[in-house]
Amino acid sequence: MASLLAKDAYLQSLAKKICSHSAPEQQARTRAGKTQGSETAGPPKKKRKKTQKKFRKREEKAAEHKAKSLGEKSPAASGARRPEAAKEEAAWASSSAGNPADGLATEPESVFALDVLRQRLHEKIQEARGQGSAKELSPAALEKRRRRKQERDRKKRKRKELRAKEKARKAEEATEAQEVVEATPEGACTEPREPPGLIFNKVEVSEDEPASKAQRRKEKRQRVKGNLTPLTGRNYRQLLERLQARQSRLDELRGQDEGKAQELEAKMKWTNLLYKAEGVKIRDDERLLQEALKRKEKRRAQRQRRWEKRTAGVVEKMQQRQDRRRQNLRRKKAARAERRLLRARKKGRILPQDLERAGLV
């Protein structure tokens, strides 16, 4: 910003110098015209006041002072612009010297020069607000700009390559899909799809809609083999009751018909074996069920005892806090009564307690 101010001050001072150079020549021409006319014409006219010249001198002094103050801050910028300013000054001097007879046109030319210089100054300011010219940048800044440009070009090329690859892949997929559609016969689409099977390296998922609750219940009943629900789960009491009910039914059937009882028992064993082959854990051992039930009841009793102990501890702690609170309240009440009696004794009152202690009552 200091360099811009220095340029502005220098251009303004240059324009004022050009105007001041043209002013003496104009005055000399007017003096010559007046002397020639005075010889031929009548009495001399009054001289005009040189207010314009004084105003220009004042402006020149202010501009020089401003240029000095800014030149101390940025001497390099002002020095860099000196050759161009010298050329412009020489051009304006030659133009003013080439037309000595045209005295009336010097003032508009100076105004035009100021406009041109001001326009150039605005162009420089706009250039500095932007990226700036490459001549004024340091080598490090130029190298940084070059690297940034290379990086932008590289990213642009990479994006273009990715777009081209994506486009080629989509076109290839479209052609493959078209070939598959053309290769499949029309009757193949109407055939019902077989239920998906389990392959160890591949799992096929059917596109059927999820079954409702009633459908799932029906499928579960169909999965029950031989109308025999498997004895699974961790509700040992229920499992033991079911197992005992089966044994009682077998005993009743054995009392009626031994052959049917043996057939039913064999059917139950085969059904349990089929369930076990599928990975279902069958709990059909009465001894193990009783032991598991005892362990479960024991753990439940232990949890119940721990809970009761914890509850009793909580109640005991609450009672202790209540007793401590009541004791503190009684102590505070006794202390307040003692303080009241002490204040009464200080005032000279004779209390019944004092009479009892003295044995006067």
UniProtKB/Swiss-Prot annotation:
GO BP: any one term: ribosomal small subunit biogenesis
One annotated GO molecular function: molecular condensate scaffold activity
Name this protein carries in UniProt: Surfeit locus protein 6
Entry keyword Calcium: no
Motif (Nuclear localization signal): 45-49, 154-158
InterPro entries in alphabetical order: Rrp14/SURF6_C, SURF6
Residues modified as Phosphothreonine: T229
Composition bias type Basic and acidic residues, residue spans: 57-71, 81-90, 163-173
Organism: Homo sapiens (Human)
